[in-house]
Curated annotation (Swiss-Prot):
SMART domains: AAA
Species of origin: Homo sapiens
Any one GO CC term of the record: cytosol
Name this protein carries in UniProt: ATP-binding cassette sub-family D member 2
Similarity section: Belongs to the ABC transporter superfamily. ABCD family. Peroxisomal fatty acyl CoA transporter (TC 3.A.1.203) subfamily.
Domain ABC transmembrane type-1 stretches: 107-399
Length: 740
């Protein structure tokens, strides 16, 4: 090898060191070409194959749904692309709503700590070189002084290291707090929390997005800022220091710089080619975690029904299936990380270490600024080269570690892309639902030539059912003018309702199951949109809805009566505990005050109170809020008839207009008008004559009881005819009627 370098140098008139540097560059270039060529060729083949596949199946990219004016496409998987940066910039507006914020303060402190750590690293690298030089020169006094300096600098260095971790956690917590505050404000505005589940189908598990997704996104952003800012600064400062050191010693930094750039570039290309789609994998993992949590919460919410049916085996299989899907996804991620980290460690630990030794050796070997050639200065020469080598090695190790963290961060960036897509999608859905834009998910079947599996796409209701109706708040009366009842799925339950309920009127609403009775209450409460017509109704504070199963909130007994008011709201309205006691007397519920330990008793009220007590608590809330209109949806079905009648009479006496859904004839006398649905889209609104309706009801029950025995009598008659071998007169008449 030496003869070859000498011959090449003599022919082109290069120095031996110049020939060695050029030879090293050529070897590195050849190695990089050998490494990158198969990867690039593979990528080009995949790209060409993808284009051919796209040309062969042009209809697979876009899927059109019948009755939809908009072409709907499947969502692209999250990745580091233009969409990712666009979503991140949109979320930045939430994280930093203005220039001077708490988050900005923590970010500045974190940046100062990162910059301080970089300068400390450079200073420690130089100090290490001086310590090694003092050892080589056999100067114990100098060694002790330098060692003391090294120990003294360790105090601020360790503090800065601890501060970096502390500030990173504080920054992540500040980001999470900002996102949670904004999410909660949007989630509880305009009843979005209801509509995002019942009217929209894009978010399967909002609780997952509001908790874990926001947490993981905040931690990932803060960690990436730390893992990218400091390494980039380290690379810049260490490179500048190394170049300055090499130049001051008379060595050329071009060769090592080119080698470093080539190695880093080759490593980046290899890692990018080998990197799995971590963004898509992490997003799918988060989705499966959310579904597993949903299955658990579903069991908890229906635990009594499952126990009655003894359905524990079915539910256990569902849980096991959901957990297995999550475990399979986690195993897939772990297996892909195994091979990716192996390749990453090989390139960054061993390939970079060998390249680093070459980069450090070349400037020191070729440098002319050391005292060389004189016998009296041999010791100085050795110590200076040792110091330069140690300092350069430490600086290079610091720079290599920084580049390694930058390149390793690509995997974390792809994971951040998954969290960013989920959090951004959550805010996007919340905003659209708040503005009355709903989209539901439909499953369509592709043609057999493309796929045998159904593709899930989003069907915007706004394309099929435009919301053209108007809702106008008025002080008096409820008026429906051509208002249809349409479910979130787009089914028309009743068409063009027209009725008017004035103050002092009491409306009874009847009809078979699924005819639209409760749906009408959802429209009046603003939960469902008015697709056509005009709805005049009082403001929400003048209407109060009581369901069949009232919600029991967390808190004291007092909180149950005044829900959703707080104690301060109660005092502002002028209520006292004595007033609440009178309300409980009205609904025959005062005994629970003594039974449960007073107004300040805190319990899990949904388990403490019986079904009838919970329904009476719902009626107590009505007397507390004193609305103009009360929407009663089978709210006293578990209350005895005598107590139920007293409550309704007290409500009428309090001046509350009742809109009641009930099947009990005993309550008809408390109403003045009737809205009856026929279950086929028809309806009628009329004044209620209780006496006539009760008479008709009694006649209906009498006929039902008489006709109930006819099938048994007919069966017995047939048996007697067979035994006697005779025909029945009724059969003869029936046959004659059929013949004629």
């Amino acid at each position: 090898m030496t003869h070859m370098l000498n011959a090449a140098a003599d022919r082109v008139k290069w120095t031996r060191s110049s020939a060695a540097k050029r030879a090293a560059c050529l070897v590195a270039a050849a190695y990089a070409l050998k490494t990158l060529y198969p990867i690039i060729g593979k990528r080009l083949k995949q790209s060409g194959h993808g284009k051919k596949k796209a040309a062969a199946y042009p209809a697979a990219e876009n899927t059109e749904i019948l009755h939809c004016t908009e072409t709907i496409c499947e969502k692209p998987s999250p990745g580091v692309n233009a969409d990712f940066f666009k979503q991140l910039l949109e979320l930045r507006k939430i994280l930093f709503p203005k220039l001077v914020t708490t988050e900005t303060g923590w970010l500045c402190l974190h940046s100062v700590a990162l910059i301080s750590r970089t300068f400390l690293s450079i200073y420690v690298a130089g100090l290490d070189g001086k310590i090694v030089k003092s050892i080589v020169e056999k100067k114990p006094r100098t060694f002790i002084i330098k060692l003391i300096k090294w120990l003294m600098i360790a105090i601020p260095a360790t503090f800065v290291n601890s501060a970096i971790r502390y500030l990173e956690c504080k920054l992540a917590l500040a980001f999470r707090t900002r996102l949670v505050d904004h999410a909660y404000e949007t989630y509880f505005t305009n009843q979005t929390y209801y509509k995002v589940i019942n009217m929209d189908g894009r978010l399967a598990n909002p609780d997952q997005s509001l908790t874990e997704d926001i947490m993981m996104f905040s931690q990932s952003v803060a960690h990436l800022y730390s893992n990218l800012t400091k390494p980039i600064l380290d690379v810049m400062l260490t490179s500048y220091t190394l170049i300055q050191t090499a130049t001051s010693r008379g060595a050329s930094p071009i060769g090592p710089t080119l080698l470093a750039g080539l190695v880093v570039y080759a490593t980046a290309k290899v890692l990018k080619a080998c990197s799995p789609k971590f963004g898509k994998l992490v997003a799918e993992e988060a989705h499966r975690k959310g579904y597993l949590r949903y299955v658990h919460s579903r069991i908890i919410a229906n635990v009594e029904e499952i126990a009655f049916y003894r359905g524990h085996k079915v539910e256990m299989k569902q849980l096991q299936k959901s957990y297995k899907a999550l475990a399979d996804q986690m195993n897939l991620i772990l297996s892909k990380r195994l091979w990716y980290i192996m390749i990453e460690q090989f390139l960054m630990k061993y390939v970079w270490s060998s390249s680093g030794l070459i980069m450090v050796a070349i400037p020191i070997i070729t440098a002319t600024g050391f005292a060389d050639g004189e016998d009296g200065q041999k010791q100085v020469m050795v110590s200076e080269r040792t110091e330069a080598f140690t300092t350069a090695r430490n600086l290079l190790a610091s720079g290599a570690d920084a580049i390694e963290r930058i390149m390793s961060s690509y995997k974390e960036v792809t994971e951040l892309a998954g969290y960013t897509a989920r959090v951004y999608n959550m805010f996007w859905v919340f905003d659209e639902v708040k503005r009355g834009i709903y989209k539901r998910t439909a499953v369509i079947q592709e043609s057999e030539s493309h796929s045998k599996n159904g593709a899930k796409v989003e069907l915007p209701l706004s394309d099929t059912l435009a919301i053209k109706g108007k809702v106008i708040d008025v002080d008096h009366g409820i008026i429906c003018e051509n208002v249809p009842i349409i479910t979130p799925a787009g089914e028309v339950v009743a068409s063009r309702l027209n009725f008017k309920v004035e103050e002092g009127m009491h409306l009874l609403i009847t009809g078979p199951n699924g005819c639209g009775k409760s749906s009408l209450f959802r429209i009046l409460s603003g939960l469902w949109p008015v697709y056509e017509g005009v709805l005049y109704k009082p403001p929400p504070q003048h209407m109060f809805y009581i369901p069949q199963r009232p919600y029991m909130s967390l808190g004291s007994l007092r909180d149950q009566v005044i829900y959703p008011d707080s104690v301060d709201d109660m005092h502002d309205k002028g209520y006292t505990d004595q007033d609440l006691e009178r309300i409980l007397h009205n609904v025959h519920l005062y005994h629970i005050v003594q039974r449960e330990g007073g107004w300040d008793a805190v319990m899990d009220w949904k388990d403490v109170l019986s079904g009838g007590e919970k329904q009476r608590m719902g009626m107590a809330r009505m007397f507390y809020h004193k609305p103009k209109y009360a929407l009663l949806d089978e709210c006293t079905s578990a209350v005895s008839i005598d107590v139920e009648g007293k409550i309704f009479q007290a409500a009428k006496g309090a001046g509350i207009s009742l809109l009641s859904i009930t099947h009990r004839p005993s309550l008809w006398k408390y109403h003045t008008h009737l809205l009856q649905f026929d279950g086929e889209g028809g309806w009628r609104f009329e004044q209620l004559d209780t006496a006539i309706r009760l008479t008709l009801s009694e006649e209906k029950q009498k006929l039902e009881s008489q006709l109930a025995g006819i099938p048994k009598m007919q069966q017995r008659l047939n048996e007697l005819c067979k035994i006697l071998g005779e025909d029945s007169v009724l059969k003869t008449i029936k046959n004659e009627d059929e013949t004629s």
